[in-house]
């Protein structure tokens, strides 16, 4: 079998095109890693109603669950947070926003703010500032509920 120069040139011209396979997919970015904060945390929230009032209420403790969901494209530093409180003074569920500083690894400071429908018939406000470790969160809370101010603390452990 004799191969001509012409056939060899045609083969050399089309060989790179055959290897391409008709195009390809665009490069993909690496899948983002999950935040240590994402997921469900459970613990205790203690509330001091009207702490600066003439007759402050007694502190009330109850179980609480916080669930953090990462907001996409925020460098794992912003979260949609659901707080479910079974505290006798503040039995609420609220959806709030949480921001993490200075970075997205523990230990980090987290700030959470939100509003909720109070069982007392008003719109309440809730805020928290805490230190988040890999498996625990310890922080303070503050807010106003119809129009009673409150302060307190929260301690959470990751499930």
Predicted features, each with a name:
Residues 1-9:
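Bacterial N-terminal signal peptides that target proteins for export
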Residues 12-13:
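Hydrophobic alpha-helical transmembrane segments of integral membrane proteins
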Residues 16-19:
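C-terminal motif of bacterial Sec signal peptides marking the signal peptidase cleavage site
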Residues 21-23:
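Hydrophobic membrane-targeting and insertion signals
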Residues 25-42, 70-72, 158-159:
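N-terminal helix-cap/turn-to-beta initiation motif at the start of protein domains
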Residues 33-64, 81, 137:
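Tryptophan-anchored aromatic micro-motifs
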Residues 42-50, 97-159:
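Beta-sheet ligand-binding and adhesion/scaffold domains
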Residues 52-101:
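N-terminal glycine/threonine-rich, aromatic-flanked beta-hairpin/loop signature
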């Amino acid at each position: 079998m004799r191969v001509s120069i012409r056939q060899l040139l045609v083969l050399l011209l089309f060989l790179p095109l055959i290897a391409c396979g008709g195009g390809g997919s665009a490069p993909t970015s690496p899948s983002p890693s999950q935040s240590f904060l994402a997921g469900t945390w459970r613990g205790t929230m203690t509330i001091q109603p009207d702490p600066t009032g003439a007759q402050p209420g007694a502190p009330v403790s109850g179980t609480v669950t916080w669930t953090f969901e990462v907001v996409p494209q925020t460098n794992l530093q912003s979260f949609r947070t659901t707080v479910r409180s079974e505290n006798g003074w503040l039995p609420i569920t609220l959806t709030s926003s949480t921001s993490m500083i200075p970075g997205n690894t523990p230990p980090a400071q987290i700030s959470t703010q939100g509003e909720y429908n109070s069982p007392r018939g008003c719109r309440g406000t809730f805020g928290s500032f805490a230190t988040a470790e890999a498996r625990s969160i310890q922080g303070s809370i503050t807010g106003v509920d119809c129009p009673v101010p409150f302060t307190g603390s929260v301690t959470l452990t990751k499930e």
